Structures are given as structure tokens and as C-alpha cells.
Amino acid sequence: MPKRPVLAVTAGEPAGIGPDLVLRLPELAPEARCVAIADHALLADRAAALGLNLELADYRRDRPAPAGALEVLHVPLAAPAQAGRLDPANGRYVLATLDAAIDGCVSGEFAAMVTAPVHKGVINDAGVPFTGHTEYLAERTGTGKVVMMLAGGGMRVALATTHLPLREVADAITAPLLNEVIRILHADLENKFGIDAPRILVAGLNPHAGEGGHMGREEIDVIEPALDALRAEGINLIGPLPADTLFNPDKLAAADAVLAMYHDQGLPVLKHASFGAGINVTLGLPIVRTSVDHGTALDLAGSGRADPGSLLEAVRLAEQLAGHAGRR
């Protein structure tokens, strides 16, 4: 029997639903060997609050835990954690769990990492500038540029820009940016998703993709020339297309991914189709990282009502991507 890949699963913000979700992994029974990276006592206390009769086993690299147990790589909390109540004292703890997962992936101990949600505000309140998982992973791995992609509902949607105010998006869409983003997207579709000659649909920026320049010239002046240069190298790009008709079933069936120009152009359609089971993937990293596509849901923490569907899908995709990355 092939050896199961070992995935690092960070439990995220200790006051949120991340610990609740991670504790559900044994019953969800993913094929991969999942190691929770969290404070052992935090998980034990949350399991008791949820009424879960679950064995927590200390992680040993060469000794998998018994069936039904959850393996835990212990990272200590800085202060006791209570479900639903943020404490900036634990901001650095959250980053320490990420560091353990990143280091394990870089060293080859873990095949991939899966992240439960963190709370950006409380990490910043701890005195640590933090804009999100994606940027932190890029900095820690020495990666100059990464691309955010969400998957779910039969779609893969990557973003040319991410968390920008809408008034800044048009200025951010440049030929060098598109060149870099599309190269990363194309390379990871091939190398991590195992797709040969991937087909990518590219959205325009303006309504009706600019309507021939009458509703904006970004398509004519920036996007189309950038796509033409990449097409000349053999990258299969279709667009720029009007975003309001791009997401129809026929177009999606003929493509492997969509590139949207900005966050709320591409993600509402995907989240409508996949809410509760969507996955965030960071492209361009030297490691495999997937994540849930929802937040910390402080109001649900410790209640037993948190839906683990997105975490399970993130684990499954991480295992798939790690397998492709290991073969190429």
C-alpha cells in the first residue's frame, strides 16, 4: 500500500471555529494522514465542550496514530483561549502554528499544508503587521509573487488583484502584472493540478469588456496586448471576455480556469455555487497550501454548528496537489 501523504493542518484563530473543524477530521476520515498544529490543551478543552470522545495523540513522524485518533503537533498558547473571545496575546501563537507548518513543508516532512481561518485584526492588535495568510506565506518562503485562486462548484477562479479598494483596481492592472499572474497560474495548473496545456478564460475589466473602447480602454491598451504576447509563447488564453457572460456553463466546460481582474468580479459566482465547500489555493509557492474559504465565525465557535465541508475539501485538494507536485 502506498504511504499516505502527511498534511499539516493549522487550527487557526483559537477563539474561532478552526479548532472545532480540525477536531472533526478523524470522523471525516480523509485518505491523507492529517496532523493538527495547535495547542494540545486547547483542542482537548474544545473537544470536551463539543462532547467529542476523541483521542489526541502526540505527533510522531515515524509512528502514525491509531485509527480514529487526531495527531497533534503541540504549539503552546500564550494565554488561555475561550471560544468566541479574541485575545491579542495569542496573535503570535497563530503565526507560530503557521511557521511550524511552513518549515515542515519546506523540509519535506509534510507534503502540504491546510489552514483554518485566522483573524487578521487580532494579529495586528498583537503588534505584528499582518495582511493575510497569502502574503505571510510568500514572505516566509521567499516568494516574490503569489496568486490567489479559489476552487469549488466545478470552477477554478484566480485573481489578478486581490484585496484592493475598487477605485485602485484599474491602475493596478498592468501588462507586467498580467504577465506574472498568468505565468504563475499556467505553471501551477500544469505542475500542481496535472493539467496539460491548460485553457484559461480571462475576464475583461470593464462592462462588456470595454465595448470596443466605449466603456474603458483597459482591454485594448493593456489586457489584450498582454494576452497576445503570452499566446505567442503557446499559453492558451481566451479573452478578454465580458464578465457577465463568462461564467456560463458552456464556456466553463471548455476551460480549466478563469482569471478575474478583481476580487468581487470573480468570487461571488464561485461562492454562490460552492458555499460551504469552497477552497482557497495559493499559487506560486514552492509548497502546496490550501485553505478554507470562510472566516473565524466567532459566534459559532464551541457550538457544534460549524460546517467542516470546506476544510475536508481543502484537505482532499491538498493531497491531490501534493501528489501531482511530487510526480512532476
From Swiss-Prot:
Pathway: Cofactor biosynthesis; pyridoxine 5'-phosphate biosynthesis; pyridoxine 5'-phosphate from D-erythrose 4-phosphate: step 4/5. SUPFAM superfamilies: Isocitrate/Isopropylmalate dehydrogenase-like. It is found in: Cytoplasm. It catalyses: 4-(phosphooxy)-L-threonine + NAD(+) = 3-amino-2-oxopropyl phosphate + CO2 + NADH. The keyword Oxidoreductase applies. GO terms for cellular component: cytoplasm. The keyword ATP-binding does not apply. GO terms for molecular function: 4-hydroxythreonine-4-phosphate dehydrogenase activity; cobalt ion binding; magnesium ion binding; NAD binding; zinc ion binding. GO terms for biological process: pyridoxal phosphate biosynthetic process; pyridoxine biosynthetic process. Keywords: Cobalt, Cytoplasm, Magnesium, Metal-binding, NAD, NADP, Oxidoreductase, Pyridoxine biosynthesis, Zinc. Its EC number is 1.1.1.262. InterPro entries: PdxA (IPR037510), PdxA_fam (IPR005255). It comes from the Bacteria. Substrate binds at H133, T134, K271, N280, R289. Its cofactor is Zn(2+); Mg(2+); Co(2+). Its main location: cytoplasm. Homodimer. PANTHER family: 4-HYDROXYTHREONINE-4-PHOSPHATE DEHYDROGENASE. Belongs to the PdxA family. The active site is located at the dimer interface. Catalyzes the NAD(P)-dependent oxidation of 4-(phosphooxy)-L-threonine (HTP) into 2-amino-3-oxo-4-(phosphooxy)butyric acid which spontaneously decarboxylates to form 3-amino-2-oxopropyl phosphate (AHAP). This is 4-hydroxythreonine-4-phosphate dehydrogenase.
